């Protein structure tokens, strides 16, 4: 196998131009636009840094996108900014970023570091899914050291189930989510296995501009070099998938089954 073939096949990952059913970098022969995508994150930064690029690409290709943040991530505040003030800065940054990308910003009100996995939180996310009606949901992988990320994963899995349950009466009718993916996040790396690449080159610079609204992206919180990590990660994933910049995802195990007459 030559180097080009290896780079395009490494990891046996599926390369997608958008999360719309195409299995190669080439655009689908169908003229159908990509569907609606909802990125559901524990904190706004997680949503934009790890899910924002695929959300922006979906919108760029004619789909629609929404970013749901379960908390404001206010406890990541630097020492010189009060926690509540930093939370509002996070909200404002998310609204500006979503506007730039053409997405809708939605917020729940759970305190940072205290997002609960219970019926109330699950039904709130279920209601958001039923209201927005996404075809694709992207969220956290379970293999995280962060309690909020772990709970967000569990909440979303159950919320997707509830959203599609016709016998569960809520304010909006049932809605089935066709596909679910998990985003690559430095905090959620345990047992994360890439099987899907999205070419984000068309929106890469716009995504960087959206991320730059966040103080933590600009290095003002001093905790982690988010800008260096995620911008470099997009380059690395692009190298492995044969494009300039890419985002890597893990598909839900329940949608990996193939039914073939032959190989």
Which residues fall in each region the model found?
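Metal-dependent de-N-acetylase/amidase catalytic core
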Residues: 7-12, 27-36, 40, 116-263
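Residues within the helices of the helix-turn-helix
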Residues: 4
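Active-site rim/loop-helix segments in enzyme catalytic domains that contact anionic ligands
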Residues: 7-17, 26-132, 250, 254, ...
